[in-house]
Regions:
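Sec-dependent signal peptide recognition
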Residues: 2-8
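Feature for extracytoplasmic/surface-facing segments of secreted or surface-associated proteins
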Residues: 20-191, 233-235, 263, 267, ...
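Acidic/polar residues in short coil/turn loops that connect beta-strands
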Residues: 57, 204-206, 267, 308-310, ...
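Structural signal for glycine-centered tight turns and loop->strand junctions in beta-sheet-rich domains
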Residues: 76, 205-209, 236-237, 268, ...
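A glycine-anchored, Pro-Gly-centered beta-turn/N-cap motif
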Residues: 188-189, 295-296, 332
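Contiguous, well-ordered beta-strand patches that form the walls/edges
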Residues: 194-198, 213-278, 300-303, 317-386
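Short, solvent-exposed mixed-charge patches
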Residues: 390-392
Length: 392
């Protein structure tokens, strides 16, 4: 992936993403080398309440529903525990701790996920809520051996009477379950920014995604669309996407540097993409939503409009038109006057006649619109009305 994944710096348009320069992960004025930098990380890509941590620099605390991240200084090691029961050993502190960071053995990694899953006292809510009853029981358990066959691990947990009659989810099933939970958590529309490029990615609850890239053409990449499936691995946060359509060259998620898989995690605010081959980290933010036009609207799961709050829009078209056009993107400016939407400038258009602009005659849409609940109805001049549904 070239370092063009992602959103609005064109013409100084960072506010279109509802973000700021700080979201790019770069710092034009780094602090002095002797200044202590405090970082924040997440534990297992989930909001797990009552996980305690202590770092080698002396920082300690407990993760809660309100405070989902742990603090650490660069170069720190960190130890995690729940009611005194250690979870793995002392590991390098970083922006996300995966099972593979805590245990080298895959069996132990899966056992850990099954264990954390079983501790959840309210599976119907987001995150993992550990009841006071279980926390008290854990205080009487000196240690738990994760590095053992699942059958033995399950027996050990059963003998502690920690979970009463609850059965642990099997190793294969827990991987699928954690994938589903993660996809649900990150589903929606995200953006970031890098140099003079703009891109938007919409992720579905099954892990499929559509990514649009608007950037100047170079020898390796160009504006275009990418569709695929993340294929995320909950054991180490890595993913090697299956690409089904790609017109943006090396931009997007299709070309990981040095063929080293990406990793993907979330802290509840940012979607954090790391590219090991380039030693680069990108933090994406959700597209701002509102009760008005600003936000994401869908015609289908792979045809979506994102309207930003400074009068820019982005159209993701993963299908194309029946009579003209093909899958692609459209990015431009719009104005609103008395419930009339007018496209004023088109900066990129790779899907020909679909969307708000027709490249064959440079015609731009001028349409009245109305919003009712979660529906947006547009009536372009001289055309039939069409309705979009609000997306997250």
């Amino acid at each position: 992936m070239k370092k063009t994944l992602l959103c609005l710096t064109l013409a100084g348009l960072l506010s279109a993403c509802g973000g700021s320069d700080n979201d790019s992960g770069s710092n034009q004025n780094p602090p002095p080398s002797n200044q202590t930098i405090e970082n924040y990380g997440t534990f297992l890509n989930s909001s797990v309440d009552n996980v305690s941590y202590e770092t080698s620099s002396g920082i300690s605390g407990t993760l809660t529903e309100e405070n989902k991240t742990f603090k650490y200084q660069s170069g720190d090691k960190v130890q995690f525990s729940i009611s005194g029961v250690q979870i793995g050993g002392l590991v390098t502190a970083q922006d996300n701790i995966s099972p593979a960071d805590l245990f080298t053995d895959e069996t132990a990694q899966k056992n850990l996920l099954s264990f954390i899953d079983a501790l959840d006292s309210d599976p119907d809510t987001d995150g993992v809520q550990i009841s006071d009853e279980i926390l008290e029981k854990l205080k009487n358990i000196p240690s738990i051996t994760f590095d053992q066959p699942f059958e033995n691990f399950s027996t050990q947990i059963s003998e502690t009477n920690l979970l009463n009659d609850q059965v642990l989810v099997s190793p294969d099933e827990i991987v699928i379950k954690q994938q589903q939970v993660f996809y649900k958590d990150i589903a929606g529309t995200w953006q970031s920014h890098e140099n003079n490029s703009v891109a938007v990615i919409h992720i579905l609850t099954n892990g499929n995604y559509i990514l649009g890239q608007a950037s100047p053409k170079d020898a390796e990449s160009e504006a275009g669309i990418e569709l695929g499936s993340l294929q995320w691995n909950p054991l180490n946060n890595s993913f090697e996407p299956t690409i089904t359509h790609d017109t943006n060259g090396t931009a997007g998620l299709s070309h990981a540097s040095d063929d080293k898989p990406y990793t993907l995690s979330s802290d509840g605010t940012y979607l954090i993409l790391h590219e090991p081959g380039a030693n680069s980290t990108y933090k994406l933010t959700r597209v701002k939503q509102s009760s008005g036009l600003v936000g994401t609207w869908k015609f289908s799961e792979t045809q979506l409009f994102a309207f930003f709050d400074n009068n820019y829009y982005f159209f993701l078209d993963g299908i194309g038109g029946d009579d003209c056009g093909w899958a692609g993107i459209e990015y431009g400016k719009y104005s609103i006057t008395s419930n009339t939407l007018a496209v004023t400038e088109v900066l990129y258009d790779t899907n020909e006649c679909a969307g708000f602009h027709d490249t064959s005659d440079s015609a731009k849409v001028n349409a009245t619109y109305s919003i009712s609940g979660t529906s947006l109805t547009l009536h372009p001049q001289g055309e039939d009305t069409f309705t979009l549904q609000r997306s997250n």
